[in-house]
Amino acid sequence: MISQFRRLYYFIFLSWTRVNGDDIKFTGNFMLASGLKISYISQDTSYLKGNLSEFAYNNKMDETLFKTILRKLDFNREQFDKNMEDFSAGQKKKVLIAKSLCESAHLYIWDEPLNYIDIFSRIQIEKMILEYCPTLLFVEHDDAFCNNICTKNINLCL
């Protein structure tokens, strides 16, 4: 196991961002241990197509577990056969959260996971995180959610 973490992959990030109309250049290094599995949720849900069974199959997920998590997130069974293109933004975000929770990963990275999510589902997501205790790095603006599940909180201000 130790030798696994001695082999690192390096990624260099160089990007630009705008803050108050000013371009800000930033760089950094990211080291990834060989064999490390990461589950990532992006803010973008526009690529979700087809129905949930197809999505589970294409992503090599346990369909029963996937749909069970979606039921905990207040999905009705009738939604299981609908096309994801017709889902609301909140329903699409729930699909990505359920997908991530179905994945066996060393690190879960979620970019604003609670965007468009209703209060009931926020509570359910919080309960699942507290129950399964994944190693989770996320960006979120909901202070109550962060305070309830975080073991360490880093505030970034630009």
Residue ranges and their predicted role:
Residues A105, C133, I149-T151:
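Short, well-ordered alpha-helix to beta-strand connector turns
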Residues S42-K99, E103-H106, E112:
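ABC-family P-loop ATPase nucleotide-binding domains
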Residues E126-K127, C133:
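A short, noncatalytic alpha-helical element within ATPase nucleotide-binding/catalytic domains
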Residues P134-V139:
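Conserved H-loop
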Residues A144:
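Conserved Rossmann-like nucleotide-cofactor binding loop
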Residues N83, I109-P113, I117-F120, I125:
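Walker B catalytic motif
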